[in-house]
Amino acid sequence: MSLVIPEKFQHILRVMNTNIDGRRKIMFALTSIKGVGRRYSNIVCKKADIDLSKRAGELSDEEVERLITIMQNPRQYKIPDWFLNRQKDVKDGKYSQVMANSLDNKLREDLERLKKIRAHRGLRHYWGLRVRGQHTKTTGRRGRTVGVSKKK
């Protein structure tokens, strides 16, 4: 970071209900938004014509608005479907990038749907067990430990 701080420097930006550290480079600062990784933030910055060496606090309001519109409407800016984190949605069949609070809502809806249709994954979630086929005989135990009493 340069020794002289510009007069319009923002130390904390508020983007999509998330506080972003203004001292970090813009590509890495955007990853603090839930649902945005390094690859997605990189392509969004390139589509918005923002210099990747800039700090997040150095951006103008117009540049921040441009970033937000591209992140919310990625398909309009020719970001490919395989790049998005919500593909062929169960309800409407659309491709989208789900971020921030809507990511939590979508995840909860998906789990509720799995539980409602009594799918194996939904039942494992309901019971609080491992879902992805891990062994559970010895690992992942929680709760009260039962010790072995010593023989007299």
Curated annotation (Swiss-Prot):
GO cellular component, one term: small ribosomal subunit
Keyword set, alphabetical order: Cytoplasm, Ribonucleoprotein, Ribosomal protein, RNA-binding, rRNA-binding
Keyword Cytoplasm carried by entry: yes
Membrane-spanning residues: none
Keyword Cytoplasm among UniProt keywords: yes
Top-level taxon in the UniProt lineage: Eukaryota
SUPFAM superfamilies: S13-like H2TH domain (SSF46946)
MF (Gene Ontology): rRNA binding; structural constituent of ribosome
Gene Ontology biological-process annotations: translation
InterPro entries hit by this protein: Rbsml_uS13_C, Ribosomal_uS13, Ribosomal_uS13-like_H2TH, Ribosomal_uS13_CS
Subcellular location: Cytoplasm
Family, as annotated: Belongs to the universal ribosomal protein uS13 family.
Family matches, as HAMAP family: Ribosomal_uS13
Function: Located at the top of the head of the 40S subunit, it contacts several helices of the 18S rRNA.
Protein name per the record: Small ribosomal subunit protein uS13
UniProt gene name: RPS18
